[in-house]
Swiss-Prot record:
Name of the protein in its database record: Prokaryotic ubiquitin-like protein UBact
Keywords, ordered alphabetically: Isopeptide bond, Ubl conjugation pathway
NCBIfam families listed in its UniProt record: ubiq_like_UBact (NF033388)
Biased composition (Basic and acidic residues): 29-50
Stretches the record annotates as Disordered: 1-60
Family per similarity comment: Belongs to the ubiquitin-like protein UBact family.
Gene that produces this protein: ubact
Segments of skewed composition (Basic residues): 51-60
Pfam family, any one: UBact
Molecular function via GO: protein tag activity
Organism: Fraserbacteria sp. (strain RBG_16_55_9)
Amino acid sequence: MPERKTQPTTDQPWTKPNDGGDESGPRSPEVERPNTRDLLERMKRVDPRQARRYRQRSGE
């Protein structure tokens, strides 16, 4: 079995490819998380039993 080759390591930390301030690529939109109370109220209107199961799973 051939020996493994080792590559030289660098002292620089790993960074994301877009960390350099590059504005050319797509980026995820900055949106706030939906309020879980509103979600539960909407679920209650559609299917009360499903809302109860979701509430038990999510710990609310």
